[in-house]
Amino acid sequence: MNPSGTIGVLEQNGEEHLATPILGPSVHSDNPQERIQARRLRIAARQEARRREALGEYLDGKKESEEEQSKSYKQKEESRLKLTKLLLCGTELVTNIQVAADVREIHRRVEEEETKRQRLEKLENEVKTSQDKFDEITAKWEEGRRKRIPQELWEMLNSQQVHCAELIEDKNKLANELQQELKIKDDQYVKDLKKQSEDITLILERMEEQVKNVMKNFRQELIHIEKAFESERQELLSSNKKKWERALQAHNAKELEYLTNRMKKVEDYEKQLNKQRVWDCEEYNTIKIKLEQDVQILEQQLQQMKATYQLNQEKLEYNFQVLKKRDEESTVIKSQQKRKLNRLHDVVNNLRTKYTKQIRQFQDDNQSLTSDYKRLVTQFKDLQKALRHFIIIDEEKFREIWLMNEAEAKELAQRAFDVDRIIHSQHLGLPWNMPDLWFLNNVGPISLQQQKSVTQILEELLLQTEDEATEAAMSEDEDYMDLPNQISAKTTTKVLMLLCDESGFLIESKLLSLLHPLEKSECYLLRLDAIFSALAIEDEDDLYKLVNFFLRYRAHRLSSAQASSSIHSNVERTSLMSALERLSLMSQTDKGSMVSKSDQEPTEQEDEQEGDNASLSSRELEEQEDLSSPRFIHPNDVLKILEAFVTGLKKPKDAQPVLKLKKETRDNSKDTEYWESLAAVIPFFKQNLWDALYKALEKYYLVLTERAKLLMENESLEQQNAEMQSLLQQYLQAKVNTELQIPPTQGFRMPSK
């Protein structure tokens, strides 16, 4: 067990211990080795404190008083402490080998650093002495060129040969020492491998021994814990059995007491029932007397009602006679109205014949216009197809030229990178990394076109729709999808509130349940947000288009109502149907067909519509100013207006007029930057480095050429020396020398070959 209080005490003691001044190494010292040693000591102290805490030991050597605990709990604590100590000892026994190996490795590395330093110093000294000797030899070669006497030249060559032999001997000696040191290191490495294998074998043996020991101790402690639990279980069984017997005795006593109390309550309830029975009989008698009196009163009222019924019957007979006379008068009026209705039927038939003729004429015109429209659409599609073909060809040519130039530029850049890599790795001995440039991964022309949403594309197409043949004629009649010039905030608020009240079906039921506790303004805002999401209204232009559509719809309904009021009341239904038909045609068909229909209206309706169109603007202004009047927009028309608006906004391509396609131009703002970046893959500082390296290599080439010349001169001198030695040998071996008293061989020493 590791109580939290004990941990807090240990941490506090550890902090106080760290806070006290330490005479040993400090972490604030300027020496890095001293700081490292101080940190190691502090970590070791903390680990020792945690080990003591895990073993149940205390820093102050005192043990807190423990509460009374069960045998099983005490046995578990004893087993835990014993096993913890066993594990710590086993771990320490196993890790001692690793610690010793680490110490040996640390000493080996320190010795290796020292020997390496000494070796480097020795090599540096050797290089300096060798360079001095080599400089001395090269200087004597310059002196030898000035000499012309063979004997002096021979002495100089002997001395140079001795110096060269000494230099080579020093180099060979150094090489032998290094080889001997390498051999010693190989032997030491083999010994270290053997030692490591022995350590690993010892660790494995100790680990197996510790595992067996731990398993054995775990089994023993488990047996002790089971025995403690078994004894505690027997004690609990005996104590619980005694408690159960005492509880049964108390329960029996309570049941006996409950039985006596129940008998007393039964007697009391019987007495109360007898009293209640007597009281009910008395109350029944009083109610019976009261009801008999009520029956007598009701019989008297029935006699009065019969008298009233007789009087009312006489009045009804009189009224029947009066109504009969009025019915006769109504039959006469009905016959007159029938004759009038027949005349009106004749008028309706005439109007229907005119209507059928106009419909036929409109259909013929529509067919002719449709054929012209289809012909123009096919021509336009052919033109678009040719245009797309040429655009694709131009783009392919542009892309091919781009890719060709790009491949050539990237090949040159790769060659430059290869040169830079060779310079860094072979000449400078520096690591070289491939530069991560954004333009090297690009393939093909750079595209910076911004993606547009579907709603933006629809708005652009709707705003760019033009029809030069019908633009002037229909600009004032049915431009429902254009933005209004100005709409007051009050008008917009009224329209939005009406839309919010009548379009609740577009809102989810879960959202409606969440909106009930909110205020009215917040509720309206959230409802309108959900409705706009359902209708795909995303910006301010779409909102004002919707408001303008509502206002134009109301103005059109007023004009159609005034036109229909000029005709007789019996053809009101026909005019209403025609107005609705015109509204649907205006929201679903193109503008050209509406021009032909409006031009071919009957002359009688043209006069009425001219008057209506003249007063249309004034009525719109009045209705926009007085939107609170009940004649603004009927709530039943809101769904129709929404349907027409959505149909007009999301109309299919075949029902829309021919749209002008906007030519998409490619953004070439980054082309210059891209090609300039490809041309400048090697920065200016690297070019300066190349120039400096080129100059150094030129100097190095001059030195090599001079060295080659010197080698050729040396070879020629060696050849001359060999010829002179052969001549001298012939001279010394001549027979004339044997006849002389002092032969020439006694005057000088022959050089050894």
UniProtKB/Swiss-Prot annotation:
Question: What are the entry keywords?
Answer: Cell projection, Cilium, Coiled coil, Cytoplasm, Cytoskeleton, Flagellum
Question: Would the keyword Nucleotide-binding be found if you checked this record's keyword annotation?
Answer: no
**What Pfam families does this protein map onto?**
NYD-SP28 (PF14772), NYD-SP28_assoc (PF14775)
InterPro entries per the UniProt record, alphabetical: DRC1/2_N, DRC1/DRC2, DRC1_C
Stretches assigned to coiled coil: 100-388, 703-739
Bias-annotated ranges (Polar residues)? 587-597
Q: What happens when the gene is disrupted?
A: Knockout mice on a C57BL/6 background experience pre-puberal death, usually before postnatal day 12, and exhibit signs of growth retardation and hydrocephaly. Mutant mice on C57BL/6 x ICR background can survive to adulthood, are infertile, and have reduced sperm counts with short or absent flagella.
Q: Where is the protein localized? A: Cytoplasm, Cytoskeleton, Cilium axoneme; Cytoplasm, Cytoskeleton, Flagellum axoneme
Renumbered to this chain, the Acidic residues biased-composition regions fall at 601-611
Q: Name one GO cellular component term.
A: cytosol
UniProt-annotated stretches for the region Disordered: 1-33, 55-76, 587-628
What does the record list as GO biological process? axonemal dynein complex assembly; axoneme assembly; cilium organization; cilium-dependent cell motility; determination of left/right symmetry; flagellated sperm motility; heart development; mucociliary clearance
> Of which family is this protein a member?
Belongs to the DRC1 family.
Q: How does it assemble?
A: Component of the nexin-dynein regulatory complex (N-DRC). Interacts with CCDC65/DRC2, DRC3, GAS8/DRC4 and TCTE1/DRC5.
* Functional summary from the UniProt entry: Component of the nexin-dynein regulatory complex (N-DRC) a key regulator of ciliary/flagellar motility which maintains the alignment and integrity of the distal axoneme and regulates microtubule sliding in motile axonemes. Plays a critical role in the assembly of N-DRC and also stabilizes the assembly of multiple inner dynein arms and radial spokes. Coassembles with CCDC65/DRC2 to form a central scaffold needed for assembly of the N-DRC and its attachment to the outer doublet microtubules.
The name this protein carries in UniProt is Dynein regulatory complex protein 1
Gene label: Drc1
